[in-house]
Amino acid sequence: MGRDGRGLRLAGRVLVPAGLALAAGAILVIGTRYTSATVNGGAMDPTYPPGELVLLEKVDAGAIRHGDVVLYRTRNRYEGMAVLQRVIGMGGDRVRQSPGGPVTVNGKPLAEPYVKDGDPSGMAQEYDVVVPEGRLFLLGDHRANANDSRFFLTEQAGSVAATAVQARVPDSRTGLLVPALTALLGLLVAAGGLTAGTVSWVTRRTGRGRRTR
């Protein structure tokens, strides 16, 4: 154990700050890359029902893909509130739909197993638009209850700027798992250092007591 627990004291002095630094760095990564939002309406039901807390990863406009569920905010819709919708069309895509029929993108029907009650149409009228470059055509998964791009067709074909996107739902939580485990490891290292420091202190106190006698 070393004279009067000096080895443990040194371990404590090294491990506590090192562990806390590791945990703080990992938590900073999580805070920088990820956010969350609570679903307020039923537009994304059944995929994300009202009240569900959704984990989101922050992305740049260039990283957005077809099918992504994104959180975006635009000043001229929804009173400036952030909303969650699915990316159907991107710049240059031709998006079409007839009542009761499937959504087609560039002439190909979309397979949409996520839509509410298997209904890809809802109450919307027929539309046929070409998405402007740098913009997105977005729909809710509950087509009969979503106030989405279909209802703003006179505003640049119902699209919103890709730069309005704040975050998207990640494909998996693996990306979050690494920094989360790193943070946990850092806390365990700090706890180990604290334990070593405590044992060292007790050892020194015990040694002094024996010498006093």
Predicted region positions:
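Extended hydrophobic leader/signal-anchor segments used for secretion and membrane insertion
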Residues: 1-213
